[in-house]
Amino acid sequence: MKVESLKTSPDRAGRYWVTFDDGSKMGLYRQTVEDFALYSGKELDEQEAEALRTAAGQMSAKMRAVRIVSAASVSRRDLEARLVRKGENPQQAKEAVAWMEDMHLVDDRATAEQVVSSCISKGYGLMRAKQALYEKRIPKEYWDEALADYPDQTEKITAFLKSRLDADSDEKQVRRAVDALIRRGHSYGTIRRALNALSFDTEDFQEEF
């Protein structure tokens, strides 16, 4: 396989595009170009070509992993799944995640703490926080520690109810407010106590609460 042309400037993703004599193209990062000492006219035997394809895939997975982690807090499992969904080779995705861990760029314990902190700041209940940890694929071994100091949400629930309801609110409006709080992960018991504190009649909600 022969290098027919090599772009001298990278694209927006930082890749240098190489065109080969068989018409195929590869977007390579600078390190890969330098590691293989590529230049226009260079001949690669089959072993070298295969090594280049492997190296290109590994570097692609690593760089994509860096971009994902830079944009959002992710767990090890979540990162690996995202890489595969984006088209990276499963084995190379696994290796990229291991590389990220070695670089201390992925930490499930720290991610769990960040997820829980975000839920608290948004006024979400404990169940919503657990759902968020599950969706982020955080291993359960980190859940208890991250959730240990989850604050009581009664004040936030009360403030929410006050913003939605008043003395003239009917049962339909109350139910709508309750449903909104349930979606935010608050328990029926805590919501009922807040309603009682605000002097709303919860007798009709007994079976649901």
Task: Walk through the language-model features, giving the residues of each.
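An alpha-helical, amphipathic repeat domain used for nucleic-acid recognition
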Residues: 1-209
